[in-house]
Amino acid sequence: MQSLEKRFAKGLGWGLIDNFSGTGINFLVGILLARQLTPEIFGIVGVSLVLVSISTTIADAGFSNALIRKSEVRPIEYSTTFLLNIAIAGAIYAVLFFSAPLFAAYYRIELLTPVVRAMGISILFAASAVVVKARLTRQMDFKTQAIASLTSSLVSAAVGLYMVYHDGGIWSLVAQQLIRQSLYAIGLFVLTRYSFTFHYSHAAARELFAFGSRILFSSLLTAVYNNLYYFVIGKVYSPRQLGLYSRAEQFSLMIALNFTLVLQRVSLPALTKNKNDGQKLESVFQRLYKFSALLGSLFLFSLAAMADNFTYVVVGKQWMPSAPMLSILAIYSAFPPIIALHQNLLQVRGESKLFMRLEVLKTFLSACIVAIAIWIDFYTLLGGIVLIGVLSLGINGYWGSKFLPTYKQFKQIKDTLYYFLISSFVAFIVFLSSKLAITPSSKLGIQIAVFTLISLFLFTFVLKGERQMLKQIVRPSVKNEEQQ
């Protein structure tokens, strides 16, 4: 029987493999597609993905978090959740299908109708996999999820690239997204060999929905809050501007989203195991907090410093207007991984009502800031996004720290500022190092080398304690995997 720490370490290790391999493949494919397609096409797909993302959140109905959070889950609760998710997903897709022309009229993009209808099919596949993913997460089995994710990413990438080089246009992106989601769901069923007993319990549904409904509302607000800019930019500006923003955001989220997803998937069950022991809960939370604040800011601040050369080398001259957007969004992206930890803390403490209220407050503040900034100019809007990140961390940190014995918000702010200052210093050196070369590719190469050398120096001589902490958190034990 493995200790929680060893299981957590393995979980985080496989979670990293899952997210970084899957997202890494899609990142590379996205680069190749961006060299063949225009920003306008990416803008259309970006709007479609937002609509599908919000619809998928509704289809989940908060049940996945409810299943993970429960101390024990009966078979009838799994089968009830599966049936509910499929039914809700079917209804949501029907609404999306018939409302697609309305969105096309709103954005004045006729092509949006068939694209939204096609990409919406992925909602059904995502809903069918909710229960299997929840069971695997409860067992901290992220290896199975990683295998399914890697396989689906490779196959969908191959299809997408084949289509784009054979004049597939926008449908190359649509096919890639659909195939990835469908194969991932099918892969989970095949690997787990899980079969459902199609039984339904109204009592079980009512119990799960009591908790899940609050998480659903909060998750829906979060989805709208995270994608609010897509709706606004696409309407107020143009599909091209939205496509440029989308590309910059995807580059910045390559790091931030992976950290956030891994921490949410792994920390939720780990924190749940210790929810009745305040000291252990705080110990796990504090290590994860430092982990996300340090690594997130270190990589993202340096990415902001490399934005010009990175954009030119990776996706070409036509995407250069997105470089300053990337610099700003990379700084903002250091905040979501830390915020996600506080959200998990509230969930494991059973504070779903507070969770929901905080999401309402943050969404309201975000809407106010966007409503003001959008009419000034585009870069004021981006500055407003960074302000939203700071305020969101402050709000979640204030209320989340109330459930920790000694690691209060003041200590968290000190840790955050300490790691952000170190990361800012590294980013400044990385920025200056580009002056040593002439061509963008050589500048980028020097910047990456300088970032790597400085990071190694810091972890070897300055951040020794943090290095040990990262080893304890990240390194999965192969020996323990064999013993499980």
Predicted feature residues:
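N-terminal membrane topogenesis motif
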Residues: 1-27, 65-83, 143-147, 188-191, ...
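Membrane-interface helix-loop junctions in multi-pass transport and translocation proteins
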Residues: 32-49, 101, 105, 113-117, ...
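Helix-loop junctions and terminal segments of transmembrane helices
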Residues: 26, 56-75, 137-138, 248, ...
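Membrane-interface junctions at transmembrane-helix termini in multi-pass inner-membrane proteins
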Residues: 5, 9, 66-75, 125-148, ...
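Interhelical loop/hinge segments that connect adjacent transmembrane helices in multipass membrane
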Residues: 1-4, 8, 143, 186-227, ...
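Membrane-proximal transmembrane or re-entrant/amphipathic helices at the cytosolic face
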Residues: 398-401, 409-412, 428-484
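Signature of the first transmembrane helix
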Residues: 4-61, 86-100, 122, 152-161, ...
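Transmembrane helical elements of multi-pass membrane transporters/channels
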Residues: 11-26, 152, 173-180, 184, ...
